[in-house]
Amino acid sequence: MQVKDLSGLHIEGHIKVYDPYSSEIYEDKRNAIHYESFSMSLAESIGNAGHGWIYQLAFGNGGTNVDPTGIISYLTPNSTGTNASLYNQTYAKIIDDKSVLNTDPIRNKIEIRHLTGKNYTDVFITCLLDFGEPSNQLAFDNATNNSDFIFDEMGLISYNPTGQGRLLTHVIFHPIQKSLNRAIQVDYTIRIQSLSGGII
């Protein structure tokens, strides 16, 4: 009789966006996983392909529409297709703390968290947009137009030496303006859980 393993993997993500100095929380929610891209990146990582790991956190301003009366409608996260991307990426920050291109690996980093005996492991990502970044941002968080740095979407991007990394996750949220008078920190958790279904 052929043995068939019924176990599998479940992946879920969660973001917390807040001011690291005042502790004001701007967003706290789950995100969509791009399972095709994630499966490819997992295989590339454990297969030592030299790419595939989490590398950047991308930010964009194309995730919502605001009508003339101020009502906000939210677009569907992009979680299918090999060419998936943010709707309109306007900024990205390297969060791979082993990369020589990471300008602040103490505050922009990736940690692996696991408790012995548990069937899940967390990838905990920290990304800080401090007061002076991005460059060319407005001085105050009172913009009335859709500037490049009024973020309403973000996603994790995998590493690829060609610079064309894959979108691994995508989350859309209420617009948050990044300006000189405001720092924004993102705590991003990806939980990878083994689903033990036994064998037949």
Task: Enumerate the language-model features and the residues they cover.
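Small cysteine-rich, disulfide-bonded extracellular modules of the LU/uPAR three-finger superfamily
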Residues: M1-F151, Y159-I200
